[in-house]
Curated annotation (Swiss-Prot):
Similarity field: Belongs to the CbiM family.
Subunit details: Forms an energy-coupling factor (ECF) transporter complex composed of an ATP-binding protein (A component, CbiO), a transmembrane protein (T component, CbiQ) and 2 possible substrate-capture proteins (S components, CbiM and CbiN) of unknown stoichimetry.
Species of origin: Thermosediminibacter oceani (strain ATCC BAA-1034 / DSM 16646 / JW/IW-1228P)
Protein name in the entry: Cobalt transport protein CbiM
Topology class, membrane: Multi-pass membrane protein
Pathway: Cofactor biosynthesis; adenosylcobalamin biosynthesis
Signal sequence interval, chain numbering: 1-20
Any one GO molecular function term: cobalt ion transmembrane transporter activity
Gene: cbiM
Transmembrane region(s): 31-51, 63-83, 95-115, 117-137, 161-181, 201-221
Length: 244
């Protein structure tokens, strides 16, 4: 009975903070907003340095960076109905991470989230650090890392891209659930119980969304290779070398 009551309480919170699972303005306590900004900013700075050093002087990479940003904006702006009147969305972060590495996407993802907060009331300024860390940092590194691991163990390119993109989506929601659990621990069970509740609720919609995003990313990457085959093929094969 206590578990049912706890889940019901979490469900009652969802419409208040979840706008496509970007944590909304004013929802996180101020100390947590500062913490997540302080964690995100070093990745933002590293991404800016990386872009200036490795991408800014290459027109083909700049075009792909712009495309990756548009892809993230389009997918993460979608708001699909979820449980208790809330909504969920794909992130789109995996495509850019696979093509260009995670550091550029730490910048692009943050810019996308800023525009969404200002133009779409989607997320917020005080919660931008938390949202950017979960999607643009954790999601990007998860997508890139699993893509590389899958390729090294012998999986096909399409399977590797699928796993990378899907994991980027799922990691975003795992970290968001952790952020909410840390800020709002359960009275019984603390952070662990709260995390289990939040992540369990959003798994209902995020698992199928992650699968769909993985499939879409494979399709988009294949189309990019057809129309920009030399550039995209080189990036897909050599992303890990670029990161070094």
């Amino acid at each position: 009975m206590r578990k049912i009551t706890f889940i019901a309480a979490l469900l009652s919170l969802l419409p208040r903070y979840a706008l496509a699972m970007h944590v909304m303005e004013g929802f996180l306590p101020f100390k947590w907003c500062l913490l997540w900004y302080s964690i995100y900013i070093p990745f933002l700075m590293a991404g800016l340095i990386y872009i200036k050093k490795n991408i800014a002087e290459e027109p083909s990479k700049k075009i792909l960076l712009g495309f990756a940003g548009a892809f993230v904006f389009a997918l993460s702006a979608l708001k699909l109905p979820s449980v208790a009147g809330s909504s969920s969305h794909p992130t789109g972060i995996g495509l850019g991470a696979i093509l260009l590495g995670p550091l550029p996407m730490a910048v692009i993802g943050g810019i996308v989230l800023l525009f969404q907060a200002l133009l779409l009331a989607h997320g917020g300024i005080t919660t931008l650090g938390a949202n950017a860390f979960s999607m643009a940092v954790a999601g990007s590194f998860a997508a890139y890392g699993l893509y590389k691991v899958a390729g090294r163990v012998g999986l096909s390119k399409s399977a590797s891209v699928f796993l990378g993109a899907a994991s980027g989506d799922l990691m975003t929601y795992i970290i968001t659930s952790l952020q909410l659990a840390l800020a709002f621990p359960a009275s019984r069970g603390g952070v662990a119980a709260s995390f289990a509740g939040f992540s369990g609720i959003f798994a209902v919609t995020q698992l199928p969304l992650a699968i769909g995003e993985g499939i879409l990313t494979v399709i988009v990457l294949n189309l990019l290779e057809i129309h920009a085959g030399v550039v995209v093929g080189r990036l897909v094969k050599g992303a890990s070398n670029d990161e070094g």
